[in-house]
């Protein structure tokens, strides 16, 4: 774990970044302007934001992260970075955590669990857009289920060698 302020500065200038998430990614509390728009303006990059309030990682219907990623994001789009929000909605709804798979096969993940959905999203993004994948967590709040999700995400990070912007464990926030 490292503090967010110590992240290596790698420019996304003139790159295409996909953001997948729910209300935080959407910017719900800020008139639908989130950090994605800020990054786009600051770094002159193209941000594709696929965010719907109240949605989950687990595949439980047409607005789940997985369904929207498959159905609304162009697989032929050039993508330089894929960033996904670790949804608090899964924690609030007590979505099953599941297990980290030993497989890397897209079709082997249990997408009705948080771990399976995370791994599916990573595998799909890597196979479809051949780009780096990152997840970001929310800052700490009173939620044992979300704490377990963050713990699982950090283990998945080791398996898949993805980036994690870990606001949950960042004591500077």
Can you name each region flagged by the protein language model?
Residues 1-19:
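Membrane/wall-proximal cationic-aromatic binding patches
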Residues 10-12, 76, 126-129:
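Short, conserved loop/helix-junction motifs that constitute active-site signature segments
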Residues 13-18, 24-108:
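Conserved SGNH/GDSL esterase-like catalytic core that processes O-acyl groups on lipids
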Residues 20-21, 136:
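Short hydrophobic segments within beta-strands
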Residues 30-34, 108-116, 143-147:
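Soluble non-cytosolic domains of exported or imported proteins
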Residues 39-40, 125-126, 156-157, 162:
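A generic structural signal for well-ordered alpha-helical segments
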Residues 118-122, 150:
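Generic structural signal for well-ordered alpha-helices
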């Amino acid at each position: 774990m490292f503090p967010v302020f110590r992240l290596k500065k790698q420019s996304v200038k003139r790159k295409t970044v996909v953001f997948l998430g729910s209300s935080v990614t959407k910017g719900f509390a800020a008139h639908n302007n989130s950090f994605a728009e800020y990054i786009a303006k600051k770094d002159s990059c193209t941000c594709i934001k696929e965010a719907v309030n109240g949605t989950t990682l687990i595949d439980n219907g047409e607005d789940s992260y997985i369904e929207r990623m498959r159905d609304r994001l162009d697989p032929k789009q050039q993508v330089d970075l894929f960033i996904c929000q670790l949804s608090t909605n899964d924690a609030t709804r007590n979505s099953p955590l599941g297990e980290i798979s030993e497989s890397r096969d897209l079709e082997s993940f249990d997408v009705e669990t948080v771990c399976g959905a995370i791994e599916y999203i990573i595998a799909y993004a890597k196979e479809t857009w051949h780009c780096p994948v990152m997840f970001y967590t929310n800052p700490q709040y009173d939620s044992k289920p979300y704490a377990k999700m963050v713990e699982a995400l950090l283990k998945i990070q080791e398996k898949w060698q993805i980036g994690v912007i870990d606001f949950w464990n960042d004591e500077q926030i």
